[in-house]
Each structure stands twice: as structure tokens, then as C-alpha cells.
């Protein structure tokens, strides 16, 4: 497997504080002066992820270690984030929360801002870099010229960075509906951002999986336009016994050509 050793796990957005935010909660001065998200009950504490309450949590305030015991499943992360946004009833509070997440997004190298990494269909410029690590887990980096779009990317990366390919493919756009953010008639464009970034993550994940399987079988890697992903009446792509990561019964939810 061809893996870049320099591609490191990204810092994930900070989880919700149980106390009223102070200036220290927002190291970026732009956000300390303009935004003060309303206090929210910590959703992490309300979800039983099967860990001992006295044992160290697999979460930290700033990062989720990919090497930590993965009782922290992708579905758990998604549920935590959805619960957080659901608790914010005012649209402006959701916008502020996204801006907070945008500030935590790791910078993307200038060399990655190329047309091949552009996410199509977004009203703003969004770049997405995807790799597969030596353990067969997906690694994502992203950036945008819009702070709101950066917030979307930050949330999706927190959910999916370090996930197995089948976990990436298992997330649907409707799973993100509770996190929709819209102010002044911009709801649809922002819903499209969620959708387009997620779809790009999934399409390119499938391309990397197919390329890796072909490489290990000694076959010619498939061209992107040769890949047709389709989900019909519960049909699935069977697991390959060649590669070393779990992709058994991978659902192909979408009907599209890359």
C-alpha cells in the first residue's frame, strides 16, 4: 500500500464544554470578540459508549486519538455531533458553532490546493485531500475560502478521519440533517455543502479501495470513470481476501459514476 508517512491524524474539533465559555475557550481573537456560543450540556456525558466512568475517556478536549481503543465508533461520533447541533435551536448559534469548528481545522498544504482536490458543486471553493494509511483507514484534510464551509469540513473530518472505508460509505446525507445551518435564505446552499463534501469523501474512498485491491492482486488499477457505484435491492460489494482491511459487505448506497 502506498502511504505517505507524513500524513498525520488531524486534530478534531473540541467537544462541548459544560460551563459558560470564556476567552480561553477561543484562542483565535476573531472569535473571542465577536462570538460567544451559548452554553450547552455536554452530549458526550449523556451517551454511554461502554467505558468506565472513572477510566480516562477516549476523547480529549482537542483530539481523538486514532490509536485509542475504538469504542469511539464513527456512529458514536456522528450521534454526539448531531446531538450537539440539535441542542442549538437558534440558527445563529449553529453558525457560531460552525465558526468555532472552522477555527480548529488543521491547515491544508498549499500543494494540495489543486484542481484534482476541488469539491465540485459547492458555491465556495473547497479542497479535499484523501489518503489511506497503512492500517487501511481513511485520512482526510480539507480547507475552504469560506469559514462556514471550513466548519462543515471540520465536522465531517472529525467524524470520518481514521474510519474504515465501509464506515465512510455508511454515512448518508440525511444523517446530517440535524446539523443543517441556514440564515437569511442560504439553507439550501449549505445543505449542498454537507452533501457535496460527504459525496466527494465517499467517491474518492471507493477509488482508493479499488486501486489498492487491484494493486495487491497485481492488476491494473481501474480508471475513475470505470467505477460505477450502485445500490440495488440491498446488494453489496463482497469482501476481498487479498487486502488487509475490513470491507466486507460494504454497502454501495449511491448510483453514480465518478
UniProtKB/Swiss-Prot annotation:
S-S bonds: none
UniProt entry tagged with the keyword Plastid: yes
InterPro entries xrefs: Fe-S_metab-assoc_dom (IPR003808)
Main location: plastid
Compartment(s) where it occurs, according to its Swiss-Prot or TrEMBL record: Plastid, Chloroplast
GO annotation, cellular component aspect: chloroplast
Catalytic machinery residues: 122
Region listing for Disordered, in residue ranges: 1-32
Ranges of Polar residues composition bias in the record: 15-32
Pfam families: SufE
Domain of life: Eukaryota
GO biological process: iron-sulfur cluster assembly; positive regulation of sulfur metabolic process
Pathway(s) served: Cofactor biosynthesis; iron-sulfur cluster biosynthesis
Keyword terms, alphabetized: Chloroplast, Plastid
Tissue expression as described in the entry: Highly expressed in flowers and pollen, and at low levels in roots, leaves and stems.
Coiled coil: none
Molecular function per GO: enzyme activator activity
Function: Participates in cysteine desulfurization mediated by NFS2. Can activate the cysteine desulfurase activity of NFS2 in vitro. Cysteine desulfurization mobilizes sulfur from L-cysteine to yield L-alanine and supplies the inorganic sulfur for iron-sulfur (Fe-S) cluster formation.
Similarity comment text for this entry: Belongs to the SufE family.
PANTHER family named among the record's database cross-references: SUFE-LIKE PROTEIN 2, CHLOROPLASTIC (PTHR43597:SF5), SULFUR ACCEPTOR PROTEIN CSDE (PTHR43597)
Protein's name in the database: SufE-like protein 2, chloroplastic
Gene from which the chain derives: SUFE2
Amino acid at each position: 500500500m502506498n502511504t505517505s508517512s507524513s500524513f498525520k491524524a488531524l486534530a478534531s474539533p473540541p467537544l462541548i464544554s459544560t460551563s459558560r465559555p470564556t476567552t480561553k475557550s477561543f484562542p483565535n481573537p476573531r472569535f473571542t470578540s465577536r462570538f460567544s456560543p451559548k452554553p450547552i450540556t455536554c452530549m458526550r456525558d449523556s451517551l454511554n459508549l461502554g467505558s468506565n466512568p472513572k477510566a480516562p475517556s477516549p476523547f480529549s478536549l482537542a483530539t481523538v486519538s486514532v490509536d485509542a481503543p475504538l469504542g469511539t465508533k464513527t456512529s458514536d461520533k456522528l450521534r454526539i455531533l448531531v446531538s450537539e447541533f440539535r441542542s442549538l435551536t437558534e440558527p445563529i448559534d449553529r453558525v457560531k458553532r460552525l465558526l468555532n469548528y472552522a477555527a480548529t481545522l488543521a491547515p491544508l498544504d498549499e500543494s494540495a490546493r489543486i484542481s484534482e482536490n476541488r469539491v465540485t458543486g459547492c458555491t465556495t471553493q473547497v479542497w479535499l485531500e484523501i489518503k489511506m494509511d497503512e492500517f487501511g483507514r481513511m485520512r482526510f484534510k480539507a480547507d475552504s475560502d469560506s469559514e462556514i464551509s471550513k466548519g462543515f469540513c471540520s465536522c465531517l473530518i472529525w467524524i470520518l478521519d481514521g474510519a474504515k472505508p465501509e464506515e465512510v460509505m455508511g454515512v448518508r446525507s440525511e444523517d446530517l440533517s440535524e446539523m443543517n445551518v441556514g440564515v437569511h435564505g442560504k439553507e439550501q446552499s449549505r445543505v449542498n455543502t454537507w452533501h457535496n463534501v460527504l459525496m466527494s469523501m465517499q467517491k474518492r474512498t471507493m477509488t482508493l479501495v479499488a486501486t489498492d485491491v487491484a494493486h495487491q492482486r497485481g492488476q491494473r488499477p481501474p480508471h475513475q470513470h470505470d467505477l460505477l457505484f450502485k445500490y440495488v435491492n440491498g446488494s453489496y460489494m463482497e469482501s476481498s481476501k487479498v487486502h488487509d482491511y475490513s470491507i466486507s459487505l460494504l454497502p454501495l448506497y449511491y448510483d453514480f459514476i465518478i
